[in-house]
Amino acid sequence: MNTEFTLTQKRALAILTLIALLFGAYFLRNYFVLIVVAAVGAYLFTPLFKWFTKRFNTGLSAACTLLSALAAVVVPVGALVGLAIVQIARMVDSVADWVRTTDLSTLGDKILQFVNGLFDRVPFLHITVTADALRKAMISVAQNVGEWLLHFLRDAAGSLAGVITSAIIFVYVFVALLVNREKLRTLIGQLNPLGEDVTDLYLQKMGSMVRGTVNGQFVIAACQGVAGAASIYIAGFHHGFFIFAIVLTALSIIPLGGGIVTIPFGIGMIFYGNIAGGIFVLLWHLLVVTNIDNVLRPILVPRDARLNSALMLLSVFAGITMFGPWGIIIGPVLMILIVTTIDVYLAVYKGVELEQFEAPPVRRRWLPRRGPATSRNAPPPSTAE
């Protein structure tokens, strides 16, 4: 093929290439999140894939890495959700036993008196809750909940084929990115008009942010969630440990933290008579749970992946708004791309020194391997050699 194009032909080819890339992005827009999740998984499990390739061929190494990734994610999450479901069933049974042994009419009268007493204390509020109004409200809530569950089950059954299709696509994309990562890296560097050095900078920043988000946000959130659930259990509330662990972990992933649950819960325990337990929950959250982030973040999050707290908060919520739950990862990655672009602009046009890459930490081998020709008493190689 003759590649000696004229200047006009080169410009036309560049425009056609840009149009093709934009059309490809538009064509695959419905699978953008799926591709990003597969790319994140492939990046995180690349060290394990390299370890397998030293012992097996490429195909077997990719299969072992895929199975390891599924086991590392599906098994713990499935076990935790299963335990939470068991605890929910036990709580439902305990509530049913309580209903059978409690005079609901007397309890309902006490609740109505309490609510009406609270309304009477509020100025300019003339509301009286009656048993009929409460009954109608409960019927309306039950109908709405039933309709929501019906729509949820209908959508879940209808999307089963879509879930299977997405899972198959994820496996293929994950394996393809895992095996062809170096080719893809070279291709991105060749297509980027800014050059391969800037491409390496972008990829390094993105990789650091992915590792920082997964290792930092998720691991720290899991530690904070378990710590918060443990404090509630120790304080005397022995129902729903795993439920609290899941809820507090999910809240800790979002920068608001699990304090929006544990602090009101501790205050409620104080008002209901468990003063020592409530104070323990509050102090545990303020002294232990909040400091888990301060202790683990410098260890788990790379320095070049740390954003300003305001930018991190905005990127997480903007990502959740645009991409759903996966926006917790995608949002900070997009924000680090914006920040890196500004840094490159300042370095090129304003002469601001660009931040250099961090040297990777030295990995110490506690049991170093010796080759067959290596001896403990062998002299070191000379400079002349």
Swiss-Prot record:
Its main location: membrane. Pfam families: AI-2E_transport. It is found in: Cell membrane. GO terms for cellular component: plasma membrane. InterPro entries: AI-2E-like. The chain crosses the membrane at residues 7-27, 32-52, 66-86, 159-179, 218-238, 241-261, 263-283, 319-339. Keywords: Cell membrane, Membrane, Transmembrane, Transmembrane helix, Transport. It is a multi-pass membrane protein. It comes from the Bacteria. Belongs to the autoinducer-2 exporter (AI-2E) (TC 2.A.86) family. This is Putative transport protein MT1133. It comes from Mycobacterium tuberculosis (strain CDC 1551 / Oshkosh).
